[in-house]
Amino acid sequence: MARYDGSGWVGKYGNEKMRNQSKYGAKAAVGPEQTGLRIDAFGLKLIVIAAMTVDHIGTLIYPEALWLRLVGRLAMPIVAFLLVEGYHHTRHLGRYLLRLLVFAVLAQPVYRLVFPHGLNVFFDLLVGLCLLWAVQRIRSRWLTAALVLAVGVAGFYVTLDWWHLGVFMVFVFHVTRGRFGWTVAALSGLLLANAGLFAVVSARTGEPGYQLINFINLGCLLALPLLARYNGRRGRDCRALFYVFYPVHLLLLYALLKVLAGAGS
């Protein structure tokens, strides 16, 4: 009989074998066996940087160009996936948590300079990593579900960058790790349920923005073909790149926005 062990279902239909093979350089943690182009973790980080930049250009400079926001949806599922991989591979979870906390605090003044409210994405990742630590130690699926739901609701009310959705993505990648078909199904279900929920909220509040952005979030599914190509390897060790790039690119875009606003006045 299968059982829940905090990281997923193990047993007859579980992923115990895959988890034991998931060292860097071993079989890919998500994608099925494929030939052709494969992508390491460094390559995925570069895609995140590009998608995030496009997304923020759309948010700040060309808000009417919704296709820019759609391209930007690639970023969060890849970041959530890499966080889960980092959690399973790190030898120093405390250092990982501390690094996220430090950069979350350092990036927040820049984030609030650019955006009027909310918390930056490093807080999403910090909360997600803490959640992984907690659920790994819970043996009850019901307590796990209650904890994940509570953290997601809290993320919505404290206005994490991705509200509840980023935390839920982290959990999805965690419990389906090593089983790509389940990853596709679970992520699709999450995003469709989220879009449906906010369609109802939008209808009841008369605010179309809720429905629009959460239908755009379905574009997160575009990240799945890229994750299917993940080869399980770290690639170049440039872990500081994303941490530094995030606040720097926001500052540069903010400066560009001010220049454009000044030129148009």
Question: What are the language-model segments listed below?
Answer:
Residues 2-265:
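Alpha-helical transmembrane segments and their immediate juxtamembrane cytosolic regions
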